């Protein structure tokens, strides 16, 4: 179970469904590498607890992405999805991904340093090219700081 998992009564959950081309490879990446607990599945889809949110991976052709999103000095893949973690959990996940040999689109780094909304970020793709961003904040109160 993810370290950020909370009881279902505490908040609403986000659901995202997207395509992958191999459910076994998806189980290895989302389950073994990211540490997401598997939920229901059939022979054409599988659900995961993605850090207390539901993702549904369906067999099909993944969306095409391109580095068209400008954030600071970087072009990031669009579209992408991701999550926000507290900084200690973010650092632990970054170390886990590095130990697993995940190739980063944008390696773990700080952005907006010293500014409101200072955050740590990393971008990587699942084995099917679906881009994922994970942000880390010292305090979740800073997520919408401007």
Show the residue positions of the predicted features.
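Vicinal oxygen chelate
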Residues: 1-9, 12-20, 49, 69-146
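Non-catalytic surface loops within mature trypsin-like serine protease
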Residues: 22, 52, 59-61, 85-87, ...
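A short local loop/turn or secondary-structure capping micro-motif enriched for an aromatic residue
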Residues: 56-57, 63-67, 140-143
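Core segments of cupin and vicinal oxygen chelate
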Residues: 19-62
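A generic structural micro-feature
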Residues: 8, 40, 72-75, 116
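Short beta-strand/turn micro-motifs at beta-sheet edges
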Residues: 2-5, 66-71
């Amino acid at each position: 179970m993810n370290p950020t998992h909370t009881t279902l009564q505490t908040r609403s959950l986000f659901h995202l469904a997207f395509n992958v081309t191999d459910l076994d490879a998806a189980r290895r990446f989302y389950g073994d590498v990211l540490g997401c607990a598997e939920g229901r599945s059939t022979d054409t889809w599988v659900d995961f607890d993605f850090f207390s949110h539901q993702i549904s991976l369906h067999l099909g052709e993944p969306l095409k992405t391109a580095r068209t999103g400008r954030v600071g000095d970087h072009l990031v893949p669009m579209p992408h999805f991701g999550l926000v973690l507290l900084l200690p959990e973010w650092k632990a996940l970054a170390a886990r991904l590095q130990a697993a040999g995940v190739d980063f689109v944008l390696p773990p780094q700080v952005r907006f340093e010293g500014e409101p909304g200072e955050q740590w970020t990393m971008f990587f793709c699942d084995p099917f090219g679906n881009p994922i961003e994970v942000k880390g904040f010292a305090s979740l109160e800073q997520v919408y700081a401007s």
